[in-house]
Structure formats: C-alpha cells, structure tokens
Amino acid sequence: MAQAWAFLLPVLVFGSYMTSLFFPTYISGPLCGGDGGGRSLFLCAQAPKDQDPSPAVSTMYKTAFHFQPAKNWMNDPSGPMYFNGFYHEFYQYNLNGPIFGDIVWGHSVSTDLVNWIGLEPALVRDTPSDIDGCWTGSVTILPGGKPVIIYTGGDKDQHQAQNIAFPKNRSDPYLREWIKAANNPVLRPDEPGMNSIEFRDPTTGWIGPDGLWRMAVGGELNGYSAALLYKSEDFLNWTKVDHPLYSHNGSNMWECPDFFAVLPGNNAGLDLSAAIPQGAKHALKMSVDSVDKYMIGVYDLQRDAFVPDNVVDDRRLWLRIDYGTFYASKSFFDSNKNRRIIWGWSRETDSPSDDLEKGWAGLHTIPRTIWLADDGKQLLQWPVEEIESLRTNEISHQGIELNKGDLFEIKEVDAFQVVSFSQTCLLGLP
C-alpha cells in the first residue's frame, strides 16, 4: 500500500568539477526508510539519452572551483607554501598552448585556498641548466623566514639536474620575482649507477638531528627506483648520502616523492624540521604507474633511512592516495592552521585534439587536509574547511507529498551543484 510522505527538503548548493553534461535533478519516491534524524542522502542523476556522449568538454563546463589557470596546459603542483599571510601555489605550466611542452613555473597566490590571484611565472627557461624545462620541485622555508625553491631543470641534451632560486624581494607579499642561484645546477647525477635522465622532483628539505639539511630526489640507482638522499649545511652545496632514503627493485622510476611526519589519530600537521613527537610515524609517497602510492613507517635517525612498517614487494599492493585521476601530488605544512595540505594533478580524460580545441588542459584537485588514521595504518584526507565557504543559497521545500513512483524536480539547481539533502520527517512511518 502506497504511503504519502511529507518531508522538509533543504538542499545545499556547492559547485563541483565534473566533465559530464548539465542535467536536471530529480528525487523519486518512495524514499528509503528514515529515522527522523535528518539522514543525508546522495542524488543519482543521468544525462538525457539523446545527449552527445563525446568526451570533448565545452568551455562552459570548465571547472569553476578547482585550481586552474585561465588557459593552456597545467600539470604537477610544485612548491605549495604558506608565507607572510598568503598561500602560494606554483605549478607546471605551458605558456604557449594546451599540450605538454615548454614548461615553466606558473604562480598564483591566495588568502583562503579558494580564491586565487594569477601572477607571472616565477621561473622560466632561461639558463643552460633549465632550457629544456623548469620541472617539478619544492619550496623550503630556511631559518629567518627565507623561502627557497629547489627544482629540476633539463639541459639541451635533456639531462636533469637540481637548481635553486630565491625571492628577489621578500617584502613583496606576492613574491613575484625569483633569482636563480649563480652556481646552478647545485646537484647533478654524476655518481656511478645514476641515470641522468631519471633524476628529478626534489622534496621539501628538513633538518636532521645533526643540524644538516636533508632532501630526497626521485631517481634510479643501479636500476632500482629510489628516493635518493642528500645533505647540506647551507642548502646550496649538497652531498649525496651513500644510501637512499628508500629504494625498491620492482617498480619504475619514482616521480614526485614526498616525505612527511604524521601522528596517529591527530589531524594536526607536523613540520618535518621541528621536533617530532614520540609515537609519530612517517609517510613516503611516490608517483609511479600513473598513480600516487605511499608507505607508512618510521624514519630511523641513526640509519638516516625510511623503514616501512610492512614491506610489500609487489608495488601493485602499495597503498594509494586516491583511486581517481590523481598524480604528482605535493603536500606542505600549513603553519597558519597547523595542518598538512596536499594537492594532486588531475589530467582529465580528453584527447590532445580535444585539449587543443578547448584551449586548456589539466587542473589541480581541491586542496585536502591529510593525516594518519588512529590505527596508524593509512592516511586519511578531507577537503580543507575553506571550501565550505562556497556553499551558498540553501533551497528549502516544505510539505511535499510523494507517493510511490512520484517524481519531484528541484529546478533551482543543477545536479552537479548539489552537496546533500536531508529530510526532517517522514509521515506514515513507524
């Protein structure tokens, strides 16, 4: 016997990226049984059958709330940081078109991780050591509040090396201009067993118990994939440690390694160069096989090495940061709110010809807070709280009766904007 249900239906509106087409939202009755407690439900919608299924995405469907430049190609996040009241997001960018090539460091700033100001590129290809591209790297805040970029550059022969740049004027709140070190490149893959075209993506630096800086670089060592470890007194002159931070003989070269401390069950971030609390663990992330994988373990200070809690030889079984289109992620310690934030690159699924037609390609995932689960076995993540500022215009319908098979269309919002809806009461239920 059909039951008539009346319920209050508040709908929260929040823009979200999707490559699909716009379509109306419908709610079909009867609803699943409720407990009167405002249970959250998810909407499922389908595009009309006569809609063109082509993967090409019109400009009107370009993401509105994810981080993305106005046009052209973008890939890896590089060197995110919080400094003097501003969040900085650097990124791999092609000034000349929506396909990979001619890579420089794009640069944008924000006060809230939501609204961004686009600036001129921070680094361009203008020296012999980076003429083939200013590739991925990191930012480290040196003592005295001095940011330094360390990044991979490619020379005319596509050999890779690490380079350094400092802000030209630290009093500029946007840090718009950067000066490359005169002694670039500061690090070359010139030791036995190293591959000069597989040596890139340096991590943020950290200070060890001996007071020396450390940094890891993705590379190959004697055919093994590795996070190569280096030491320095001044962040300018580096010496390779005689063993990697960690290595593995069953995977491809590790791109975009990331290394950071986490405390089980505590979503506060940890600065790797500060005193690490007792009981803390470390995460080693690597980008490999087109996905981002990671291990949880401890940083053995005596051995100066990462030791996984569980050694898994089959890389297919390593933990993953994300099961979607997510690669080349970069995290940073946000001293403003004492948290660790991570970004990833979403390449999307359009073809190069589609990208050329659109005029843009690639975006960064919404920034997420990342921390270690209570059991210390896996990383957890959630969009930063600032994203909720985009949720506006709550829609409320009251006294709507749905009989079995009825449809009620919410016309005020597109399905891709709906965050959730809930009912405060269901009449006719026990």
Regions found by a protein language model. Name each.
Residues F86-E89, G145-I150, D210-M215, G269-L272, ...:
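Entry beta-strands of beta-propeller and related beta-repeat scaffolds
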Residues L95-G101, G154-Q158, M194-N195, G218-L221, ...:
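Short consensus segments that form the blades of beta-propeller domains
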Residues G38-S78, G97-F100, V114-I141, P173-W206, ...:
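Surface loop/turn signatures of beta-propeller and other carbohydrate-active proteins
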